[in-house]
Amino acid sequence: MRLRRVTEARLPTLWGNFLIVGFEENFTGHNHIALIYGNITGSDPVLTRIHSECLTGDALFSSRCDCGFQLKTALHCITEEKRGILIYHRQEGRNIGLLNKIRAYALQDNGADTVEANQCLGFAPDERDFTICADILKLLRVKKIRILTNNPKKVEILNKSCINITERVPLIVGRNPENSRYLDTKASKLGHLFYSYHK
């Protein structure tokens, strides 16, 4: 296992009381967290959101993406479900880092789309490693989930990592004039899906 469970505490939020669990990667020291709501033990699939870090969307309420909207909606859905997990996957800017994400924004301001901007900076369209999230689920002893995502790459990688996904639950929120091109590019170039998936 590439990471370990380090610490946990109660985390009261606008949506209810979660348990926040901190994880640390063994070789890099990078940290990730999971927010757990309710009882996630048992054989029923657990509603799960893997949310990649987005400082601009999550904390600064940027309209350039749908990340902040997705974060709030996911927390609401999990509490409505009475049980669930949100993994906060700390790979900012599809894992190119915050400063490179700002550089990518500047390229987008000059006409590039989100994929072209990454490539202009020498990165793949998506540099994230979702196997870390599979390891977190295994440390939480969760093997069967319903995943809140529009991203088929997450489904594919988690399935390959022996996480049983029984349903893909779309999370389609936050479209606005500032991010409509970004969302269209995610669909056309990154393969994001906007319909539900049942196994």
From Swiss-Prot:
Its cofactor is Zn(2+). GTP binds at residues 49-53, 70, 92-94, 114, 149, 154. It catalyses: GTP + 4 H2O = 2,5-diamino-6-hydroxy-4-(5-phosphoribosylamino)-pyrimidine + formate + 2 phosphate + 3 H(+). Disulfide bonds: none annotated. Keywords: GTP-binding, Hydrolase, Metal-binding, Nucleotide-binding, Riboflavin biosynthesis, Zinc. Its EC number is 3.5.4.25. InterPro entries: GTP_cyclohydro_II (IPR032677), RibA (IPR000926), RibA-like_sf (IPR036144). It is an enzyme of class 3 (hydrolase). It holds the Pfam family GTP_cyclohydro2. CDD domains: GTP_cyclohydro2. Homodimer. Belongs to the GTP cyclohydrolase II family. HAMAP family: RibA (MF_00179). This is GTP cyclohydrolase-2. It comes from Blochmanniella pennsylvanica (strain BPEN). The lineage of its organism: Bacteria, Pseudomonadati, Pseudomonadota, Gammaproteobacteria, Enterobacterales.
